């Protein structure tokens, strides 16, 4: 899998396509994360997710990390089984995301043959299995990408031999997203996020 600064061989099974995430809610399948420091240490993410972030940076993909990983970033240490990437589905960005995926998957992206498939409204693509599944989304509840993009939270990830920028959904829009989703786990996250906003 290809965006490493220094190439190291990966076994295909380290990140494999999973079209059916059944069982991903079991405690054994979840990754417990602590709040990351900044810049984020290279060991915080799994090697494959770090590799994917390098690919996104290399191709200048417009994305923001959302979901449980974003909640963790804002200080709520809890379990999550994936990293959710919210991406712009405009033509240029869909094309460069397709290119990034093609490099990451060495030219053989599971189930995807053209960048236009990344533009299907409400598209959700899942690669891998918990606790390190990659989820790609072009829509999330309560938040439009173009409205949120200027307010994104930018931090740096240690990626030898240099730092690379990564993007998180900002706290205000993460709260809007959780309010719109309103699942039990979202409501639990919401209590913490609102408390964090008041104290912050």
Model regions and ranges:
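Compositionally biased terminal segments of proteins
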Residues: 2-200
């Amino acid at each position: 899998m290809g965006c490493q600064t220094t190439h190291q061989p990966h076994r295909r099974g380290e990140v494999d396509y999973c079209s059916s995430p059944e069982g991903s809610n079991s405690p054994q399948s979840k990754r417990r994360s602590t709040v990351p420091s900044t810049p984020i240490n290279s060991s915080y993410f799994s090697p494959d997710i770090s590799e994917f972030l390098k690919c996104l940076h290399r191709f200048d993909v417009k994305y923001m990390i959302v979901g449980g990983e974003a909640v963790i970033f804002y200080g709520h240490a809890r379990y999550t089984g994936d990293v959710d990437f919210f991406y712009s589905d405009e033509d240029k960005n869909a094309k460069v995301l397709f290119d990034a995926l093609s490099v990451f998957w060495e030219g053989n992206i599971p189930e995807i043959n053209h960048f236009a498939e990344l533009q299907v409204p409400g598209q959700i693509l899942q690669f891998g299995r918990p606790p390190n599944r990659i989820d790609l989304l072009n829509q999330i509840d309560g938040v439009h990408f173009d409205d949120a993009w200027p307010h994104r939270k930018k931090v740096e990830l240690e990626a030898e031999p240099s730092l690379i920028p990564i993007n998180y959904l900002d706290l205000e829009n993460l709260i809007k997203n959780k309010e719109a989703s309103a699942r039990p786990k979202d409501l639990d996250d919401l209590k913490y996020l609102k408390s964090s906003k008041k104290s912050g």
